[in-house]
C-alpha cells in the first residue's frame, strides 16, 4: 500500500485573550459566567486575595484553543485541538511546519522526535510548546487513521476491554452518581493560607457528599497544585473517615520529593495521584519513581498520543495506573488499549454539572459523551478519532507559511 505524503499543515485558534471570551473548545477553562469551573477553587494564586475568587481573574483562560489540521496530498485531512491558542499557531506555522510537510502520513514518530528535539532550547519542561507539539501529534494520528480507514485505537493494537467506565469531575458528585458514573471528583476551595479553617471547610464538603452519595460511591479531591506537604497530609487524614478514594495534584509538578513524602504520610488505602501538568516523558519517569498510585497525563499537553503510550508503559512497569486527565476522544482511543487504565475521567463542562456536555464543545462535531457512565468501543469505530472540525466556529488563522 502506497501511503500519501503530508502536503499542508494549518493552525487556527478560537478564544483566549485576543479573541472572544467564553469560547470553550480545546481550552475548557474558557467558559462563560456562572460556571463551576471558574468558581472559588483553590489554586497557587489563591494566596493573593484579588485572585482568590476566580481562576479567570489570574488569566487561566488567556491561551484559548489551538486547532491543527494536516492535509495529505490525496486531499484527506486530520485535525486535533488543544490549549495553546494564537501562540501555538505561530509555533506550528513558523517552526514545526518544516518537520511535517513532505513526510509520509505514517511518519508520526519521526515527526514527533524532530519536533521535540528542535524545540528543546525554548520548550523547557512542557507548557505552551508541549501543548502545541501534542496537538500536532494528535492531528497526525487522526490523519493516519482516516487514510487507512481505521480508528486510532485499532492502530494502537486494539481494545483490551469492551467499554470505558468513567468517573466525573465537577462540583456535584451527587448528580454524577445519578447519571451512572462510578465516582465524582470535586475541586478543593481552600489552601494553606486558610489554615485549619480551610481544611474544615473542605472536609465538610466531602462529608456532605458522602452523606448524599452513600458509602460506596467514589469521592476524590482535586487540589490543583494549591497545597504544601503538611497541609495536604492534614487534609488527607481529615478526609479519611469519609472514604476518600484519592487526593490529586496537591503540589506543583516539580516537587517530586514532596510527592514522595506525601505518599509516605497519606492514610492507608488512600491513593495519591498527579500528572496533568507534567509535560515531558522524563518528568513522568521521575514522578513514577515517587511511588504515587496513579499518573494522570493530559494527552493534549504531555507530548501527544505518542508520548502518552510511553508514559503508560512506564506506569505499567511499576504497577501503577495511568488515568489521563480528561481529553475526550483523544484519551478514549488510548485508554481502551491500556491494560493499566481500568477507568477514565469525564470532565463536566455544563455550568451546573446537571447535564452532559461534550468536553470540547463546540469545536468538535460527533464528540461522544458517556451513557450511564460508559462508552462502548463500538462508539469509537470511526476512522481516526471519529470526530470532525466544526468550521462554523470563529476560526482565526493569524499566521501562514
UniProtKB/Swiss-Prot annotation:
Record site feature (Transition state stabilizer), residues: 345
CDD domains: MR_like_2
Catalytic activity entry: L-rhamnonate = 2-dehydro-3-deoxy-L-rhamnonate + H2O
EC id: 4.2.1.90
Domain of life, per lineage: Bacteria
Disulphides: none
SUPFAM superfamilies to which the protein is assigned, alphabetical: Enolase C-terminal domain-like (SSF51604), Enolase N-terminal domain-like (SSF54826)
InterPro entries linked to this entry: Enolase-like_C_sf, Enolase-like_N, Enolase_C-like, L-Rhamnon_dehydrat, Mandel_Rmase/mucon_lact_enz_CS, Mandelate_racemase_C, Mandelate_racemase_N_dom, RHMD-like
Keyword annotations: Lyase, Magnesium, Metal-binding
GO terms of molecular function: L-rhamnonate dehydratase activity; magnesium ion binding
Sites annotated Increases basicity of active site His: 298
Entry annotation: catalytic residues: 325
Cofactor(s) needed by this chain: Mg(2+)
UniProt: substrate binding residues: 29, 55, 345
Keyword Lipid metabolism attributed: no
Record GO biological process: amino acid catabolic process; carbohydrate catabolic process
Subunit structure: Homooctamer; tetramer of dimers.
Family (UniProt): Belongs to the mandelate racemase/muconate lactonizing enzyme family. RhamD subfamily.
Function text: Catalyzes the dehydration of L-rhamnonate to 2-keto-3-deoxy-L-rhamnonate (KDR).
Matches recorded under PANTHER family: ENOLASE SUPERFAMILY, MANDELATE RACEMASE (PTHR13794), MITOCHONDRIAL ENOLASE SUPERFAMILY MEMBER 1 (PTHR13794:SF58)
Other facts noted in the record for this chain: Reaction proceeds via a syn dehydration.
Protein name: L-rhamnonate dehydratase
Gene source species: Klebsiella pneumoniae subsp. pneumoniae (strain ATCC 700721 / MGH 78578)
Amino acid at each position: 500500500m502506497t501511503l500519501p505524503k503530508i502536503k499542508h499543515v494549518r493552525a487556527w485558534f478560537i478564544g483566549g485573550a485576543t479573541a472572544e471570551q467564553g469560547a470553550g473548545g480545546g481550552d475548557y477553562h474558557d467558559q462563560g459566567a456562572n460556571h463551576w469551573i471558574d468558581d472559588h477553587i483553590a489554586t497557587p494564586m489563591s494566596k493573593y486575595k484579588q485572585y482568590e475568587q476566580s481562576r479567570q481573574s489570574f488569566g487561566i483562560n488567556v491561551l484559548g484553543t489551538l486547532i491543527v489540521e494536516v492535509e495529505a496530498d490525496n486531499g484527506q485531512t486530520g485535525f486535533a485541538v488543544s490549549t495553546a491558542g494564537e501562540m501555538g499557531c505561530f509555533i506550528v506555522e513558523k517552526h514545526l511546519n518544516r518537520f511535517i510537510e513532505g513526510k509520509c502520513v505514517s511518519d508520526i514518530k519521526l515527526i514527533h522526535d524532530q519536533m521535540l528535539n528542535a524545540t528543546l532550547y525554548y520548550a523547557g519542561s512542557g507548557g505552551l510548546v508541549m501543548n502545541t507539539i501534542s496537538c500536532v501529534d494528535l492531528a497526525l494520528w487522526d490523519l493516519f487513521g482516516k487514510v487507512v480507514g481505521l480508528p486510532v485505537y485499532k492502530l494502537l493494537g486494539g481494545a483490551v476491554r469492551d467499554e470505558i467506565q468513567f468517573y466525573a469531575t465537577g462540583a456535584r458528585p451527587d448528580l454524577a452518581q445519578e447519571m451512572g458514573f462510578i465516582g465524582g471528583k470535586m475541586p478543593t476551595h481552600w489552601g494553606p493560607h486558610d489554615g485549619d479553617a480551610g481544611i474544615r471547610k473542605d472536609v465538610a464538603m466531602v462529608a456532605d457528599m458522602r452523606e448524599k452519595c452513600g458509602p460506596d460511591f467514589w469521592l476524590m479531591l482535586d487540589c490543583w497544585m494549591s497545597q504544601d506537604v503538611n497541609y495536604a497530609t492534614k487534609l488527607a487524614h481529615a478526609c479519611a473517615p469519609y472514604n476518600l478514594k484519592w487526593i490529586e495534584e496537591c503540589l506543583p509538578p516539580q516537587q517530586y520529593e514532596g510527592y514522595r513524602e506525601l505518599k509516605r504520610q497519606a492514610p492507608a488505602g488512600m491513593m495519591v495521584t498527579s500528572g496533568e501538568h507534567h509535560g515531558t516523558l522524563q518528568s513522568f519517569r521521575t514522578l513514577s519513581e515517587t511511588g504515587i498510585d496513579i499518573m494522570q497525563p493530559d494527552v493534549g499537553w504531555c507530548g501527544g498520543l505518542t508520548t502518552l503510550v510511553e508514559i503508560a508503559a512506564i506506569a505499567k512497569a511499576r504497577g501503577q495506573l495511568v488515568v489521563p486527565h480528561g481529553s475526550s476522544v483523544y484519551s478514549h482511543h488510548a485508554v481502551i488499549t491500556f491494560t493499566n487504565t481500568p477507568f477514565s475521567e469525564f470532565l463536566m463542562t455544563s455550568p451546573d454539572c446537571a447535564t452532559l456536555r461534550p468536553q470540547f464543545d463546540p469545536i468538535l462535531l460527533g464528540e461522544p459523551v458517556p451513557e450511564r457512565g460508559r462508552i462502548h468501543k463500538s462508539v469509537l469505530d470511526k476512522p481516526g478519532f471519529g470526530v470532525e472540525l466544526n468550521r462554523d466556529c470563529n476560526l482565526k488563522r493569524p499566521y501562514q507559511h
